[in-house]
A protein has these predicted regions:
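Active-site and NAD+-binding cores of ADP-ribose-processing enzymes
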Residues: 1-223, 246-449
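Short active-site loop/helix that positions an aromatic residue
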Residues: 236-247
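Short, well-ordered beta-strand elements within core beta-sheets of diverse protein domains
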Residues: 227-233
Length: 449
């Protein structure tokens, strides 16, 4: 038996575990402080748990065995030394204990082979949460959508601590939008297939270019049928791609100022969430935290992945439930979500911007309420004075509103139409980017090149 005192252990939480297990009659073999000490066998069992949970063997890969490459990570001795911060003599004892723990007398073999094993941190331990998420998806689709206890429990586990999460730069993944922030303007486009529909919408752009009123709008990625939501983007060109206009249609594109502070969950930052600096791999609470962190890194892509039109009802169900949960969570107090555009991504180019969806509580536009109806007069064409010629030259004349109107007003509109920002795009062609695959004719599938 070999004993070590807490002061000879560099890792903070492991030092605490040694302190709890230390006995006065045990003398530390690595210093002369005379403090109570614990058996290094206990340290070895803790190290075994950490290696099994967070590390994987890297010295048994094809590149190492057949091509003599140096394994990724570190050998066992260095790994234990880095984990524990103990004197090298104590590390050697722990390595001996681990080899003893891993040896199977029945087979005469060690768990990690006879050679010196090398270990590297696992790229992800998110599978338990990933499995639970897939079960939740099936439960929502096949069992209960509303008041689903399985979904509520998992969503709280995944999202409940978002308010405390930080990215690799120490920034919150919930960002501020609105006055005096870096995000003050959102762009929104709407597609029209006739001039009459376009002209009608421009007569009340605050209402008809903004979010649909309750009970009218179609279901979307983050909202159910008839549930108001403002879908916009941080750059105008993204709006055109997102509405997927047919050739010959028109798009009315407008900028909306964010006029009050909003809190937006940035899905792009989920992939960069880090653990607190004081997190210890020896602390049992760290494993679920790492599982959650690794799952969050995948979740942003899941929630913003492209969805085929014929699968929208099925695949949007989960993202709609997530949005409902976030919108109603009192402690998080989230007004919307920022997520990557699935329609305007170019492999070799940085993204031009991102999509933004504002939940109902933050989707209202100033002057969109019923107050005398239309707010503007519109003329799409300019005509030659003395001839038959005409050309497309849209112009809008905003009318004065009735300031003494006593109807139902919006108490806290979050957006205001920038009146001079409206642009009409006539869609004359659509360009697609694709990757082609030649279908090879074969006599047997084993003959494929």
């Amino acid at each position: 038996m070999s004993f070590i005192c807490p002061q000879c252990v560099g890792e903070r939480y492991l030092r605490y575990q040694v302190q709890v297990a230390a006995e006065p009659e045990n003398a530390c073999e690595y210093c002369d402080r005379g403090e109570s000490a614990a058996d290094l066998w206990m340290v070895a069992t803790r190290c075994e748990d950490v290696l099994d949970t967070f590390f994987e063997l890297s010295s048994n890969t094809m590149a190492v065995i057949h091509f003599g490459r140096t394994p990724a990570g570190h050998d066992l001795h260095t790994t234990i030394s880095n984990l524990t911060g103990m004197p090298q003599e104590a590390v050697e004892v722990v390595v001996e204990h681990l080899n003893s723990l891993w040896y199977d007398e029945a087979s005469g073999e060690s768990l990690y082979g006879d050679d010196d094993p090398w270990f590297v941190l696992k790229s992800s331990i998110a599978e338990p949460l990933g499995y639970a998420w897939r079960e939740m998806e099936e439960s929502l689709r096949a069992d209960v959508r509303y008041f689903n206890p399985k979904a509520a429990e998992l969503l709280e586990l995944v999202f409940g601590e978002l308010i405390n999460d930080l990215d690799k730069d120490g920034q919150s993944i919930i960002i501020e939008a609105g006055p005096d922030t870096s995000l003050t303007t959102l762009y929104r486009g709407r597609v029209f297939q006739t001039e009459d529909a376009l002209a009608s919408a421009l007569q009340w752009p605050e209402r008809l270019l903004g979010s649909p009123v309750a009970g009218i709008g179609a279901a979307g990625r983050m909202n159910g049928q008839g549930q108001p939501a403002f879908y916009g983007a941080t750059a105008p060109e993204i709006c055109i791609a997102e509405v997927r206009p047919p050739v010959g249609s028109w798009i009315a594109l407008a900028a909306f100022e964010v006029i009050r502070p909003l809190r937006l969950l940035d899905l792009r930052r989920l992939a960069t969430v880090v653990l607190p600096s004081e997190a210890s791999l020896f602390n049992p609470a760290t494993r679920p935290a790492v599982e959650r962190r690794d799952f969050l890194r995948e979740l942003g892509n899941r929630l913003s992945a492209p969805v085929m039109p014929e699968l929208q009802d099925r695949d949007y169900l989960v993202t709609q439930v997530v949005a409902d949960y976030l919108a109603a969570h009192c402690r998080l107090n989230i007004d919307g979500i920022i997520y990557p555009s699935a329609q305007s991504t170019h492999p070799d180019e940085p993204p031009a911007g991102s999509n933004v969806v504002l939940f109902r509580k933050a989707s209202e536009v100033a002057d969109a309420e019923e107050r005398g109806g239309e707010t503007a007069e519109i003329a799409l064409w300019e005509f030659e004075e003395d001839g038959p010629q005409k050309w497309f030259h849209p112009a809008i004349l905003f009318k004065d509103r009735d300031e003494h109107w006593y109807g139902c007003r919006l108490f806290h509109p979050a957006l205001s139409l920038r009146r001079d920002s409206i642009v009409i795009h006539e869609i004359s062609a659509v360009r697609y980017e694709s990757k082609s695959y030649k279908v090879e004719c074969v006599f047997s599938f084993n003959d494929r090149c």
